[in-house]
Amino acid sequence: MVLAPLAGISDSVFRRLAREQGASLSYTEMVSAKGLYYKSPGTEDLLRIDECEGPVGVQLFGSEPDMIAFAAEKLKDRPNVLIDINMGCPVPKVVKNGEGSAMLLDPDNAARCVEAAAEKAGKPVTVKMRIGFEGKDGVDADHPYDYVGFARLMERAGASAVAVHARTRQQYYSGKANWKAVAEISDALSVPVIGNGDVKSADDARRMLSETGCSLVMTGRAALGDPWIFAEWKDPKASKKHRSAADISKMMLRHFGLLRELKGDRTALMGMRKHFGWYTKGVRKAAELRRQVNTAQSADELIEYINAAAELS
């Protein structure tokens, strides 16, 4: 089971926690190929990767083959790292530049980007795609998208694996994922296919693997506040039903501690607020604590609230 790239979330700490729970692979947040070329502030920070994270995919976004090639070459000597090219991001500011899911509209250029990366990287290059640009229900009946053809083209261009988010760009993250498309792509390719979309639990992951024939299953949003999902994948007996408030509090303390080491108290404090909300989602009587966490002004104050969460039931 694989941790998806999550903008603003899948930093080194989150990847480490996922790995400790059993994730076989994780991805960085999206890294701009142009940002690497122009040395944009903050871009290098996204490439902080610790060996304890296990194998990590650096997810590049960009639509210019020469920029993708530059970024891939820059990463070639990084150990335990593969290169992934984002062809699925639906966000308008990315799409308007011809990047992310807009690359589905120019398959030939997408293939050139893969070829450029594969030539320079000296390591596996993968692609994360969607199953089309238009279509509210995962299918555009009037103008069906040839997602199998696109995936095949990526394989021919040198992709070592293809991750498929089984939604269109128009769907963003809503509506039902079209697992049938994952099955069709899995049937057509000789390289591994990673299925993604509507994997909300370890049981969903097992079902996707069985129903689609994909090689690996990727989850993203389901891991927010629940890094244990990877442990449940490896061991069906590791059910969340047996997880106590104390277990959740302990994980939050570790998460916050690692964030402080990586980013310093202030940045860690701001970042941990959203994670506290995810960790305590569905926990009875947690609403007031969440409100207090969102106004916490120091690391010690936040730790006090995290410890208090251990007493909730």
Regions found by a protein language model. Name each.
Residues 1-313:
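Flavin-dependent oxidoreductase catalytic cores
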